Amino acid sequence: MLIAQRPTLTEDVVDEYRSRFVIEPLEPGFGYTLGNSLRRTLLSSIPGAAVTSLRIDGVLHEFTSVPGVKEDVTEIVLNVKNLVVSSEHDEPVVMYLRKQGPGAVTAADIAPPAGVEVHNPDLHIATLNAKGKLELELTVERGRGYVSAAQNKTGEQEIGRIPVDSIYSPVLKVTYKVEATRVEQRTDFDRLVVDVETKHAISPRDAVASAGKTLTELFGLARELNVEAEGIDMGPSPTDAALAADLALEIEALDLTVRSYNCLKREGIHSVGELVSRSEADLLDIRNFGQKSIDEVKAKLVGMGLHLKDSPPGFDPSAVVNDFEDDDTSFAEDEQL
């Protein structure tokens, strides 16, 4: 059976709605395979919400104008297409906008129902004069990809309802590149860098996670043909392997003082893994193992990125006074009593 080193995925956050994801090391050629699949899935298959149609009070079709409104209906429709919304509803929902002039009409004037959110409230929709008045009824639906206005038009659509091109995808832009990376003596492994920029309706992390779930479901269909078929198995990640190695270390490697070391050995704690499975309360129950010994152990563990059971990470070893040797002699005397 072929075993490949398990790749790692890291995220470099550029801003709230843009991140770079690095996956490495990948077997030669897999960078383009995975990068192209991720890009296409991110751009076309992430579910989202969009306006599918609108109705303007007093307007029968889009090739007209509204009294007191600077923009004609076609311009208003184009502006509405740029709305960024999210919806928790599987069924179509309706939002309303009612504004009396004079002044600008923005997405902040929309009153969305519960479960629907408008993410770009500063979006300009129209401009009203002193006598202007605008009333909109916006239908929001969930979907994927792009759906044209013609496709959103239903056969029994009411007079005055204007279908809108719907861009459901919450992902704005995806680019990727494949670089060479080194694994031991080989330099032909792939390093995949995927740059993802999203609308305000979703974070890049959630978008990539959604794309990964979709691809896993699809590729799972091929595996169902023969679940025992041989492939390339992924070995443990470098992080898991390093952690396992640290946990397997004997406590001698911690270079503890004589008091702390002897107390732990007497209690039957021989490895770092056995040590981190104990809480502070467990260790304090050990004879002659006091708070000073607890602080020493915590200081040693934090240097390895570990901590005792039920203890929060982040212990500051610099706060511990390095005087652990003071009681070693008295402890030795206690041992002989």
Swiss-Prot record:
Q: Which residues form a coiled coil?
A: none
Bias (Acidic residues) occurs at 323-337
Chain positions covered by the region annotation Alpha N-terminal domain (alpha-NTD): 1-226
Q: Where is this region: Alpha C-terminal domain (alpha-CTD)?
A: 243-337
From the UniProt entry, list the residue stretches annotated as the region Disordered. Answer: 315-337
Q: Which Pfam family name is an example for this entry?
A: RNA_pol_A_bac
Q: Quick check: keyword Nucleotidyltransferase in the entry?
A: yes
A single GO molecular function, which one?
A: DNA-directed RNA polymerase activity
The reply to whether Transferase figures as a keyword in the UniProt entry is yes
Q: Which GO terms describe its cellular component?
A: cytoplasm; DNA-directed RNA polymerase complex
Q: Which reaction does it catalyse?
A: RNA(n) + a ribonucleoside 5'-triphosphate = RNA(n+1) + diphosphate
Keyword annotations for this protein? DNA-directed RNA polymerase, Nucleotidyltransferase, Transcription, Transferase
One GO BP annotation of this record: DNA-templated transcription
E.C. designation(s): 2.7.7.6
* Subunit: Homodimer. The RNAP catalytic core consists of 2 alpha, 1 beta, 1 beta' and 1 omega subunit. When a sigma factor is associated with the core the holoenzyme is formed, which can initiate transcription.
Q: What does this protein do?
A: DNA-dependent RNA polymerase catalyzes the transcription of DNA into RNA using the four ribonucleoside triphosphates as substrates.
Protein family according to the UniProt entry:
Belongs to the RNA polymerase alpha chain family.
Known NCBIfam families for this protein? PRK05182.1-2, PRK05182.1-4, PRK05182.2-5, rpoA
Q: Show the domain comment.
A: The N-terminal domain is essential for RNAP assembly and basal transcription, whereas the C-terminal domain is involved in interaction with transcriptional regulators and with upstream promoter elements.
Q: Which HAMAP family is this protein grouped with?
A: RNApol_bact_RpoA
List the protein's name: DNA-directed RNA polymerase subunit alpha
